Amino acid sequence: MANHRIDRVGMEIKREVNDILQKKVRDPRVQGVTITEVQMQGDLSLAKVYYTIMSDLASDNQKAQTGLEKATGTIKRELGKQLTMYKIPDLVFEKDNSIAYGNKIDQLLRDLDNKS
């Protein structure tokens, strides 16, 4: 039963953080950032927020990470306004490499298909 609550809170945080990034955060470094997944710690005190960015450049990835870290306070404050929780979890932002990995696999499969 508790796992359902953890999953629901994670989904709600994902939706709200995406909304906050689009509407409230004006930092150009976080433009184009999309939240892909939120993993909650069992006691709901920590949320690992995985994000992706359209650009593959390392400098853009670093800028996005820095921008998200700087905006953490704003995001957490806005989450406090939107969520009915006793304590808003601490946010840790990590780059989600699964999309790039999937694109790499897709490219390898296309290359194999073209060779045969």
Swiss-Prot record:
- List the subcellular locations: Cytoplasm
Choose one Gene Ontology CC annotation of this protein and give it.
cytosol
GO terms (BP aspect): maturation of SSU-rRNA
Coarse class of the protein's main subcellular location: cytoplasm
Mind telling me which InterPro entries this protein's record contains? KH_dom-like_a/b, RbfA, RbfA_dom_sf, Ribosome-bd_factorA_CS
Q: Which residues form a coiled coil?
A: none
Q: Name one GO molecular function term.
A: ribosomal small subunit binding
Q: Provide the family line.
A: Belongs to the RbfA family.
Q: What does this protein do?
A: One of several proteins that assist in the late maturation steps of the functional core of the 30S ribosomal subunit. Associates with free 30S ribosomal subunits (but not with 30S subunits that are part of 70S ribosomes or polysomes). Required for efficient processing of 16S rRNA. May interact with the 5'-terminal helix region of 16S rRNA.
Name of the molecule in the record: Ribosome-binding factor A
| Gene coding for it | rbfA
